[in-house]
Amino acid sequence: MIYTYGVSLQGTYHIKNGIVCQDSHCIKKIANNIVAAAVADGLGSEIHSDIASSIAAQIATEYCADHITEDLTDTQILGILHSSFQIAQEQIEQEAKRNNDELDQYDTTLSLAVLINNSLFYGHSG
């Protein structure tokens, strides 16, 4: 059995200064023995990092949920993780372009883990 928990909260400094929470997470249970979880930390100095972190966490986990199954090899799973980062980056780039913003206003980190049975696959960018 896999149990998960996650929360992204606005800290006291952010509340005091009227700054939105720039951190995001997403957890997707793919099957009884497969879960994908992402954490993205938006760069505090960038105006749209909250949007970028949300897109990154959501898109990466959704991509994994749509493509990972138990019967894949380790190499295939790692390839899907890598692709999920690329897809998330593309979505962030599209968001910036759609809003006529500079891409560097959308900076975020992304950590992604996929647990399948007793095997953990992990990727990080940022």
Language-model region placement:
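PP2C/PPM-type serine/threonine phosphatase catalytic domain
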Residues: 1-126
